[in-house]
């Protein structure tokens, strides 16, 4: 079964970038919360960069997944589509939960700094810092597991369809594809209808 970087590593890299963003925040906290003039606002830096990078990688994975979906959905069970979408949902839930934890952390640190209670500032930040790391790792593993399972199962069923072992129609998304006639006017006569042959693993 053919593999390439585009199809099978974007989800992993996206979740890795997200986790690293919150892990590096612990290093940032050690420098920004222990100086003579602690600054809580810098705690947004690495998580923000991690979220942006992760979102870009995941965007391309979703884009490529959806590119041929209207035509290839007839050849694999629709439950794998829901499995993939569940992975996407968990990914964004991961971001949401960690942004909330980060906001609580910055608010707590800002209040303590404004009260000029610099003693134990970093120690008080550790629980939320490590909670964010733990949550990001846990939810990232779930997201990767769901997305990779969907990719693999779809690959397998597309290859079976290519070999003449199609999936039962009642298990697939059999809704018809809406064709834009304006876009097909310029196509040559004799184009073949969508089928399972060709590049079967672009999902």
Swiss-Prot record:
Membrane spanning stretches: 9-29, 42-62, 86-106, 126-146
Keywords: Cell membrane, Membrane, Transmembrane, Transmembrane helix
Region (Disordered): 164-203
UniProt feature, compositional bias: Polar residues: 194-203
Any single Pfam family the record assigns to this protein: DUF5453
Main subcellular location: membrane
Membrane topology label: Multi-pass membrane protein
Composition bias type Basic and acidic residues, residue spans: 164-174, 182-191
Compartmental location: Cell membrane
InterPro entries named among the record's database cross-references: DUF5453
GO cellular component: plasma membrane
Protein name, per record: Uncharacterized protein MG028 homolog
Record organism: Mycoplasma pneumoniae (strain ATCC 29342 / M129 / Subtype 1)
